[in-house]
Amino acid sequence: MKVIKLEDLLGTEREVDDGNWVSRRFIMKDDNMGYSVNDTIIRAGTETHIWYQNHLETVYCIEGDGEIETLSDNKVYQLEPGVLYALDKNDEHMLRGGSKDMRMVCVFNPPLSGREVHDENGVYPADLD
């Protein structure tokens, strides 16, 4: 069994800061669970283009506020604590931080290796290993 404390991830290679967001990666590919789990902070007032062509992601908002816009149809959904969204079709989207930092629990399949950052198209590589 694994028990992981957030405080033990801070300042390590499992904490990845991309400017608009900081992701603390609890479970990764090398944990052999078949998925990865991140605790991610989306910074207030930011806008990030994301298009996970190689991953599916489910996201649950636990703090703060913001919005997500699906670029295929320009629908905008408000995000606040208690809202979950699933990018089940590799949906290209814009993620916007609101008036406060937004804290999200993110699950990826296939799992992240831990070093991923978005490329110029908002994509994580399929596999860094």
Swiss-Prot record:
Pathway: Amine and polyamine biosynthesis; ectoine biosynthesis; L-ectoine from L-aspartate 4-semialdehyde: step 3/3. Keywords: Lyase. Its EC number is 4.2.1.108. GO terms for biological process: ectoine biosynthetic process. It catalyses: (2S)-4-acetamido-2-aminobutanoate = L-ectoine + H2O. PANTHER family: L-ECTOINE SYNTHASE (PTHR39289:SF1), PTHR39289. NCBIfam families: PRK13290.1. This is L-ectoine synthase. It comes from Marinococcus halophilus. The lineage of its organism: Bacteria, Bacillati, Bacillota, Bacilli, Bacillales.
